[in-house]
UniProtKB/Swiss-Prot annotation:
GO molecular function terms attached to this record: lipoyl(octanoyl) transferase activity
UniProt tissue specificity: Expressed in roots, leaves and flowers. Expressed in cauline leaves, stems and siliques.
Its job: Catalyzes the transfer of endogenously produced octanoic acid from octanoyl-acyl-carrier-protein onto the lipoyl domains of lipoate-dependent enzymes. Lipoyl-ACP can also act as a substrate although octanoyl-ACP is likely to be the physiological substrate. Together with LIP1P is essential for de novo plastidial protein lipoylation during seed development. Acts redundantly with LIP2P2.
Major subcellular location class: plastid
HAMAP family on file: LipB
Record pathway: Protein modification; protein lipoylation via endogenous pathway; protein N(6)-(lipoyl)lysine from octanoyl-[acyl-carrier-protein]: step 1/2
Gene for this chain: LIP2P
Pfam families, per the entry: LplA-B_cat
Protein name: Octanoyltransferase LIP2p, chloroplastic
Miscellaneous comment as given in the Swiss-Prot or TrEMBL entry: In the reaction, the free carboxyl group of octanoic acid is attached via an amide linkage to the epsilon-amino group of a specific lysine residue of lipoyl domains of lipoate-dependent enzymes.
Length: 278
């Protein structure tokens, strides 16, 4: 199986961290609701919406980095650049962050069940696969908040709002751990990288994901907690069974809505012009 070393000398992404009381008590910046009395114009965000496609991880990774470089070039020229968000699913793959070691793999890396990529994002090892919605915001934090902890909390907040507003599922953060949890189950993993205040990598939300491949790793380096998905939570609750494809559609719509509101962005759908992406 392919092992790719992709560590770059950029600003480190953050995955696990310990929060001080001040950080823990700090509220996520409130969202401004645009209405007739609010004349602030939201910034444009180019959206490559491939949520119903399986995109190979290596292609999406290279794509992100090329967009980051384009934005950095514009910034160096003192030109404005729109934010970007990519939404997709991946073919089955394991990715390792900057904190990862092979101790968290329950298999010989030379005989891995899927490709394994060592990346420059923060955090440990995780799995991506069909039924998991992956969101890669590539945004200029100079236009938002130049604070990586704030950015991580905002990504968590987006998922928490999706679960609450769409399914009335109460999700939460856990002190000292990055991600989103429902009870003892982690439903969303987050790992980022930032270069000159341009973000990439992002969040992965388990919707209908087959959870079996998580058994072959120690997800995010956490041994004493489970991984869950929205489908399982709904089956355990009062909502009952929901068709897999319909569930993906519903979560996708909610995810984009909450993302645009949280970061005050106007989503503009784009067409993927590079046939090599798919």
């Amino acid at each position: 199986m392919e092992l790719l070393n992709g560590v770059e000398t950029l600003v480190s992404g953050i995955h696990h961290h310990h929060r001080t009381n001040a950080k823990r008590n700090r509220l996520v910046r409130s969202v401004k609701i645009l209405n007739s009395g609010n004349h602030e114009i939201p910034r444009k965000c180019l959206c490559f919406d491939l949520y119903d496609k399986l995109v190979p991880y290596k292609k999406a990774w290279s794509w992100q980095k090329s967009i980051v470089e384009e934005k950095k070039t514009l910034i160096d020229r003192n030109q404005d650049c729109a934010d970007t968000v990519i939404l997709l699913q991946h073919s089955p793959v394991y990715t390792m962050g900057t904190a990862s070691t092979e101790d968290y793999l329950n298999f010989d890396i030379k005989d891995a069940p899927f490709n394994v990529y060592r990346t420059e994002r923060g955090g440990e090892v995780t799995y991506h696969g069909p039924g998991q919605l992956v969101m890669y915001p590539i945004i200029n934090l100079r236009n938002h908040e130049m604070d990586l902890h704030w950015y991580l909390r905002m990504l968590e907040e987006i998922v928490i709002r999706v679960l609450s507003s769409t399914f009335s599922i109460k999700a939460s953060r856990l002190d000292g751990l990055t991600g989103v949890w429902v009870g003892n189950q982690k439903v969303a993993a987050i790992g980022i990288r930032v270069s000159k205040w341009i973000t990439y990598h992002g969040l992965a939300l388990n919707v209908t994901t087959d959870l079996t491949p998580f058994n072959w790793i120690v997800p995010c380096g956490i041994r004493d907690r489970k991984v869950g998905n929205i489908k399982g939570l709904l089956e355990d609750g009062e909502h009952g069974m929901v068709d897999d494809l319909r569930l993906i559609d519903i979560v996708h719509e909610s995810l984009l809505k909450e993302f645009s509101e949280a970061f005050q962005l106007q989503i503009e759908k784009q067409t993927v012009s590079d046939p090599n992406i798919l």
